[in-house]
Amino acid sequence: MRWSDAQEEKLISAIHPLLVRGWSSRAPLAAAFLAALAILSPASKAQTAATPASSNTAAPAHKHPAADPAPSAPVKTIGNHTAPITMEVFSDYQCPSCGNFYETTLRSMIQDYVASGKVYLVHHDFPLQMHNYSGQAARWANAAAMVGQFPEVDAALFDNQAKWTADGDLEKYVATGLSPANFKRVQAILKGCTGPAPTSKVDHTLPQPEAGCPVDPYIIQDIVLGTQVPVQATPTFVIHYKGQSYPASSGFITWPILKQFFDTLLSQ
């Protein structure tokens, strides 16, 4: 499917009140986009169509193998949402600086301050048009997030960035972070994702979701959010603490320096 002009207007209108307030809340802004997405989604109609008619006749009992739970909206977060500090990161999985930022800064932060409940990490996809595979990588991450495996695939993508950037075999390296059963679930979600993945455009036009690809709208909502921040380069991060939000910063920062900043906030 393609976004119509009316749909684009509804999406922007739904999030506009939050955007004009700026980054004034510590709560992740992705929730606003999920609400906006619901405006455009025919979910309620589909649910009605899928609801069986009531009957007074009891259906015969059958034993079936337990089915995999239906995938839900992707949760691309690590840590406890009640942590005093929230850090939102806009990232491109193929961006070398993003890979370096993850390996040398975010990994240590996750092991130390996220694990201890001090920081809540929120990932936003901002795949750049200049990278051949960044949009596809975002699809894998979102599909994994739909089945509760985001941290595992997030790490697998960054750990193997140089390899899949060279050979384009994302599937092989994503599999290293998942059990065989979870990998099959992720593959099933992406079954209809055969065309080009959405990426941020140089001219800032809104990318179009592929019909039959359930993860594309979530990537697009991150791109729209990043454009409004605005994201000028990847990685870009925004930090929230006690109702205060600190302006978006781009580029690389070491963990010791970031940790010192967090400690200063926590001491207030």
Located regions from the model:
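C-terminal cap of thioredoxin/glutaredoxin-like
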Residues: 3, 8, 12, 19, ...
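Compositionally biased, proline/threonine/alanine/serine-rich low-complexity intrinsically disordered stretches
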Residues: 46-65
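N-terminal signal peptide c-region/cleavage motif recognized by signal peptidases
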Residues: 41-43
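Structural alpha/beta surface segment adjacent to cysteine/selenocysteine redox centers
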Residues: 83, 91-179, 229, 268
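Conserved S/T- and glycine-rich ATP-binding loop of Class I adenylate-forming
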Residues: 87, 95, 237
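Bacterial N-terminal signal peptides
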Residues: 28-39
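A short beta-strand-turn-helix
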Residues: 68-85
